[in-house]
């Protein structure tokens, strides 16, 4: 049984008789009292899809739920559902747009390394790769010779995500984006 301080994003835990997926974790250290850190977790109920906010002490013991990750690819959008196809047996997995709203910003038809998270034979979420390559659809014109400066400008990506990029990057460039920090990592290798 792991401690609350060991739980990571996209983990599945059992709490109060429910299976919950961890969507976000915020660590806080209360001032003026003895004791450890507090971990505020935004959780999603696997069955109802409802949001649950819980706070745990660092030493609280939690149970992992039985979960598996299936390598998949984004296939198509069907109304309010995103459909992913299993890379091995071509099983389609339907996920509600709301339950994967944060991850949608990093997914296009070419995104590789996606895993569908399965709990009790039902898809409950997706795990993204550490970085993805996305196309810049709109940004200010590039400035020649600006590669040495550390100034940045906003850039709109093909998925609707806006990130800060160096001034020498222009519209139409493909860039690598860190999915955890939502930050520019560099130009994508052109092949």
Swiss-Prot record:
UniProt-listed GO biological process terms: peptide biosynthetic process
GO terms for MF: translation elongation factor activity
Annotated Gene Ontology cellular component terms: cytoplasm
CDD domains assigned: S1_EF-P_repeat_1, S1_EF-P_repeat_2
NCBIfam families: PRK00529.1, PRK04542.1, yeiP
Family: Belongs to the elongation factor P family.
Protein known as: Elongation factor P-like protein
């Amino acid at each position: 049984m792991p401690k609350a301080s060991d739980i990571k994003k996209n983990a599945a835990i059992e709490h109060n008789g429910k299976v919950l997926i961890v969507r976000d974790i915020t660590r806080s250290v209360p001032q003026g009292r003895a004791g450890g850190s507090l971990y505020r977790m935004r959780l999603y109920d696997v069955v109802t899809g409802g949001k649950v906010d819980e706070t745990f002490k660092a030493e609280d013991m939690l149970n992992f739920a039985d979960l598996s990750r299936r390598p998949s690819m984004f296939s198509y959008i069907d109304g309010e559902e995103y459909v992913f196809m299993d890379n091995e047996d071509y099983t389609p997995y339907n996920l509600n747009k709301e339950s994967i709203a944060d991850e949608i910003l990093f997914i296009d038809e070419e995104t590789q390394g996606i895993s569908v998270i399965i709990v009790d034979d039902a898809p409950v979420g997706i795990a993204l790769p550490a970085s993805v390559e996305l196309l810049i659809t709109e940004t200010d014109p590039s400035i020649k010779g600006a590669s040495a400066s550390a100034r940045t400008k906003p850039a709109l990506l093909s998925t609707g995500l806006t990130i800060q990029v160096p001034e020498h990057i222009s519209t139409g460039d493909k860039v690598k984006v860190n999915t955890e920090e939502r930050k520019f990592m560099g130009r994508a290798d052109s092949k």
